[in-house]
Amino acid sequence: MRTLLAATVLSLAAATALAQEPAPRMADGHPDLSGVWWPGRDLPVPPVRPSAAPRPAGPSPIPPHREKFDDFYNDVAKTRARTLGDKDDPTLRCQSVAFGTINVSAYNTGLVAQIIQSPKFVVILSETNPTFRIIPTDGRAHRDEQPPSSRGDAVGRWDGDTLVVDTTNFSDRNWMHAEGDVSFHSDALHIVERYHRIDKDTMEVEATVEDPKVLTKPWVVPKQTLKLAPFDQIMALDCTGVESAALMDAASKTNYGKKK
């Protein structure tokens, strides 16, 4: 009996050790974040955007898919939010969101992204609405002389085993994600993301968003726990002009796609 118990304990210990295989490391000692990452199967299904329904009487509300921002908007932003509908969403025209490709909150919507890491750069590729980010990790400063862009200018640094990505210099033409929702931002947007590979199969991602022209306080994005996907290459799911036109047409037929 004692022998059987000892064998069982050893078996469980071995299984636990196997399940918690440490994160791989680069030659320089930093964790290797490379791999295809997704939310796994244990996350709740994200809410579906509302279908056409009668508008309530009174002032136009902030559409449900932008409610996440309501506690953060300043008064000017709240006024603007009430005038915008789905048809104003630039992601329906195949434009990327401000977080770039590995959007912390977009994983709630099933985003799949691939990370490729070298000693000087971390490259992040998105499967949906394909785009990419090239993040230098060699200590260089922001390229303030570059024109603003939808992905901004990102630089990375290591804080222990955590990759910290600081992104500034955004244009105000695209929108940002908020826990699966989308809304506008200004050119003062500043995002700090943190990527920590806990073990071989698990990575935590979190971020803090600041935008003094739109938000009254920083928005701290809920931490996401991602899993290493059982495949090593993403697909290229193009957002084409035909798909974009269909999305815009559908948005224009809902009440939330119409300005009051």
Where are these regions (language model features)?
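PEST-like low-complexity, intrinsically disordered acidic/proline/serine-rich tracts
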Residues: 18-260
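N-terminal signal peptide c-region/cleavage motif recognized by signal peptidases
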Residues: 14-16
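Positively charged n-region of N-terminal signal peptides that target proteins for export
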Residues: 1-5
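Short, linear, compositionally biased motifs with a strong N-terminal bias
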Residues: 10-11
